[in-house]
Amino acid sequence: MSKTHKLVIFDTETNGFRGSSVLSVSISIIDAVIDNKLNLESFLKVVDFNRFYYPVEFEYDAGAYEAHKLDKERIDKLRKEHKGPPYPEYFLQDEQIANVFKDKEALFIAHNIAYDRDLIRIPLKKTFCTMLSNAKVLKIPGPYKNTFKNPKLIETAQYYKVIKDEQEGVFHESKYDTELCALIVWRMLKSKNIELLTALGYTEEEIFKATQY
């Protein structure tokens, strides 16, 4: 019998480093259907969010701006282009988004999820990090002997062949990064990645049986 898993894949852009305001959040909620042999049957986006907020800080961080180009003028423009109902000006006031992150059944996924989790300020029950889980998959040499560095999103995407080199210029947009992370997760499920299947609740015995040929 097949089982449907709810995945919440997300990314944020901020006004600086840890503890600063969230300027944008992008979320893709996906139903992943997996059969009893742990084959991925379908990977369907149910709903997505792409929202922009103002910082509570008095200034926009120059270093962060260089990465994502979000300032008051651009945020004004992007909020005006939003076609759905209006939403709060500040991230921590957005109850609809907060309710998404309060889901106790979903698996929350991000690249470097520890960083994003701190910004949300809501305990996430089940999480998975595409960065940490792929360090030993990509095996990019780390700074010390016999270590691997944590791969960047672009490095992970290139490994799973879900990005072309000429697409690099569009990075640091939360919407694009979320879509790219979703493609990485799709590839990982297709290949029956053990860490991801474990995060979804499958037992060691189930995974062993499904990965034997």
Mark where each language-model region is:
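Conserved beta-strand -> loop -> alpha-helix junction used to position metal-binding or nucleic-acid-contacting
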Residues: 125-139
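Active-site-proximal helix-loop-helix substrate-binding element of RNase H-like nuclease domains
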Residues: 59-77, 135-179
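Acidic, Mg2+-coordinating catalytic module of metal-dependent nucleases/exonucleases
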Residues: 104-114, 119, 152-213
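Active-site donor-binding loop signature of nucleotide-sugar glycosyltransferases
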Residues: 53-54, 130-132, 162
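Ser/Thr-centric signal marking residues that sit
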Residues: 12-15, 130, 181
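Conserved non-catalytic scaffold segment of RNase H-like nuclease domains
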Residues: 2-124, 154-159
